Amino acid sequence: SGKNMGAFKAVGYPEDVGEYYMLENYKAHTWTAHGRFPTNTPGWWGGAHPFTLLDWSIVHNGEISSYDANRRYVEQFGYRCNLQTDTEVITYLFDLLVRRQGLRLDTAAQILAAPEWDVIDRMPEEKQKVYTVLRTAYSSALINGPFSILVGSKHGLLALNDRLKLRSLITAEKGNKTYFASEESAIRIICPDPEKIAAVDGGTPIFIPFAREGDR
C-alpha cells in the first residue's frame, strides 16, 4: 500500500476476499477491483490485482505480447520483474514515465498505446510531430497485445484500451461518479440507471483527475 491507499489481495473468490477484509467498513473516493483468472501465469496472491507499487494501483485484463521487450526496457532503469505477472511490467512503465521521468499520466498512456505509424502520418502536423517523438523515443515502452487497464494513483484514475480494442472496456457516468468495467452488466449492478454509458475507444486514454485535497 502507498500513501492514502490500501490494497486487499488474496487467492479466492472476490466476494470471499471482500468479506475477509471487511471492505464494507472502508470508505474511499476511488476504488479499483478485479476478479482475475490467470491464463499464462501462476495463481498466487502476489500476482492478484490490484497490482500495487507506492501510490500506483493497477488492474489489467488481457495479455501483453510485448512483455519481454518491455521487461528489458524497465530493467535498464533498475526494475526487476519477479512476480510472474505481465501486469508488473505495466506498473513499472507507469512508475518510470510518470514518477521518475516527470511525464503526465495521460502522456504515459499515449506512449504505452501509441497509434500505428500510418495513423500518425495522417495527423495534423503539430500532433504528428508529438507522436513521432513519443513513438521514437519510447519505442520499447509500447505495449502490444489485447488489454484493458485501469490505473489509480495520486494523480487520478486512468482507463486505457489496446489500440485495436481487442478487450472490452466500458465507461459510465451518473452525477459526479464515473465507472469503468469490462462489461456493462457489472456497472449496472452498482449503478442500474447511468446517465451516460459508452465503450472506451481503443488507444484513447480517459483520465479522471482528482480534485485538490481542499476541494473534496
Task: Set out the residue ranges of the language-model regions.
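Conserved short alpha-helical segments that host acidic/polar catalytic motifs at enzyme active sites
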Residues: 1-216
